[in-house]
Amino acid sequence: MAEQTFIMIKPDGVQRGLVGEIISRFEKKGFYLKGLKFVNVERAFAEKHYADLSAKPFFSGLVDYIISGPVVAMIWEGKNVVTTGRKIIGATNPAQSEPGTIRGDFAIDIGRNVIHGSDAVESANKEIALWFPEGAANWESSLHSWIYE
């Protein structure tokens, strides 16, 4: 199986109409969309997703933010998709994100940074299992041989 990552467009990204732009950037890179959900997140689910941050002082505000509106949860697949996906997204703090990255182009405040992306293969697997217990769609693009050797 090729490497997969979990990407979530946060409520601010949805409200600002950035869903198509964000999906386009991953598709143009050559990654495959293998799962997509447009959902309103329940508090308990958000707390489970961000459980590793539960001791941080910003945890409560982060959970409130994630449940404030719908999110787009996605599985993306491709060679080095976790590392490359993080580069496409940019630094967690938009002030440190390069122009050309999603956060560098569309975010200003760390508390409204548009998008979440798995930081490692292990966390991607955990997040995908949480958000997509049914698994990813089973398909391969007809463009595969034009993108990968």
UniProtKB/Swiss-Prot annotation:
Gene Ontology molecular function: ATP binding; metal ion binding; nucleoside diphosphate kinase activity
List of catalytic residues: H116 (pros-phosphohistidine intermediate)
Alphabetic keyword roster: ATP-binding, Kinase, Magnesium, Metal-binding, Nucleotide metabolism, Nucleotide-binding, Phosphoprotein, Phytochrome signaling pathway, Transferase
Cofactor: Mg(2+)
This protein's record includes keyword Transmembrane: no
UniProt-listed GO biological process terms: CTP biosynthetic process; GTP biosynthetic process; red, far-red light phototransduction; UTP biosynthetic process
Enzyme Commission code: 2.7.4.6
Catalytic function, reaction form: a 2'-deoxyribonucleoside 5'-diphosphate + ATP = a 2'-deoxyribonucleoside 5'-triphosphate + ADP; a ribonucleoside 5'-diphosphate + ATP = a ribonucleoside 5'-triphosphate + ADP
Coiled-coil region: none
Pfam families: NDK
Binding site for ATP: K10, F58, R86, T92, R103, N113
Family recorded in the similarity comment: Belongs to the NDK family.
Family annotation (HAMAP family): NDP_kinase
Task performed by this protein: Major role in the synthesis of nucleoside triphosphates other than ATP. The ATP gamma phosphate is transferred to the NDP beta phosphate via a ping-pong mechanism, using a phosphorylated active-site intermediate. This NDK is microtubule-associated.
Protein's recorded name: Nucleoside diphosphate kinase 1
Naturally occurring in which organism (per UniProt): Pisum sativum (Garden pea)
Lineage, opening ranks: Eukaryota, Viridiplantae, Streptophyta, Embryophyta, Tracheophyta
This protein's encoding gene: NDPK1
